[in-house]
């Protein structure tokens, strides 16, 4: 009886997650006999409650690449501190390769103002009022990783106080 309840809870947890395919690209590797084709999939998954992950998978078929990307995304989940207005506490920047992403909180009701893979990350993280700008690179993988890097660097007021060994009063 307990096992049935446990499996229902895990099914509920799994259904909360949303997955979006950012890119599926056919890539080649030059080997002795010629070229070997494979597929690379970039997936972003999130629960719209402050958790998001970026995953990359490669396989000889598209379905296998997507499955590998989903498992990679689950391994690379990050927690994002959200404010009461479904935004972020402060301005952050993230880098990955030549890509630079600047993410700023915006006024309530302004929505998600961002493009490409950065927009997908912010939507799946549950952020509703945000402004983001991609600089440097148009590569979706580097921009997604730069956005994730920026969101990792978010700090809350209480975490800063704890780091400085200060009290709230």
From Swiss-Prot:
Gene Ontology terms: cellular component: chloroplast; small ribosomal subunit
GO molecular function: rRNA binding; structural constituent of ribosome
Family matches, as InterPro entries: Ribosomal_Su5_D2-typ_SF, Ribosomal_uS5, Ribosomal_uS5_bac-type, Ribosomal_uS5_C, Ribosomal_uS5_N, Ribosomal_uS5_N_CS, Ribsml_uS5_D2-typ_fold_subgr
GO biological process, one term: translation
Subcellular location: Plastid, Chloroplast
Domain S5 DRBM: 17-80
Swiss-Prot/TrEMBL keywords: Chloroplast, Plastid, Ribonucleoprotein, Ribosomal protein, RNA-binding, rRNA-binding
Transmembrane segments: none
NCBIfam families tied to this protein: rpsE_bact
UniProt domain comment: The N-terminal domain interacts with the head of the 30S subunit; the C-terminal domain interacts with the body and contacts protein S4. The interaction surface between S4 and S5 is involved in control of translational fidelity.
Family listed: Belongs to the universal ribosomal protein uS5 family.
Function of the protein: With S4 and S12 plays an important role in translational accuracy.
UniProt cross-references to PANTHER family, sorted A to Z: MITOCHONDRIAL RIBOSOMAL PROTEIN S5
Assembly mode: Part of the 30S ribosomal subunit. Contacts protein S4.
Name of the molecule in the record: Small ribosomal subunit protein uS5c
Gene transcribed to yield this protein: rps5
């Amino acid at each position: 009886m307990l096992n049935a309840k446990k499996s229902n809870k895990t099914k509920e947890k799994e259904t909360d997650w949303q997955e979006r395919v950012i890119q599926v690209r056919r890539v080649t590797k030059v080997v002795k006999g010629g070229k070997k084709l494979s597929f690379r999939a970039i997936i972003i998954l999130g629960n719209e409650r402050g958790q998001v992950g970026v995953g990359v998978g490669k396989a000889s078929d598209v379905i296998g690449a997507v499955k590998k990307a989903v498992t990679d995304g689950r391994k690379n989940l990050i927690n994002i501190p959200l404010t009461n207005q479904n935004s972020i506490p402060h301005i952050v920047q993230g880098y990955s390769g030549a890509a630079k992403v600047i993410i700023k909180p915006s006024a309530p009701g302004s929505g998600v103002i961002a493009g490409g893979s950065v927009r997908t990350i912010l939507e799946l993280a549950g952020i509703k009022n945000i402004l983001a700008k991609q600089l440097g690179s148009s590569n979706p993988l580097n921009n997604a990783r730069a956005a994730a890097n920026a969101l990792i660097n978010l700090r809350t007021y209480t975490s800063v106080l704890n780091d400085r060994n200060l009290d709230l009063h």
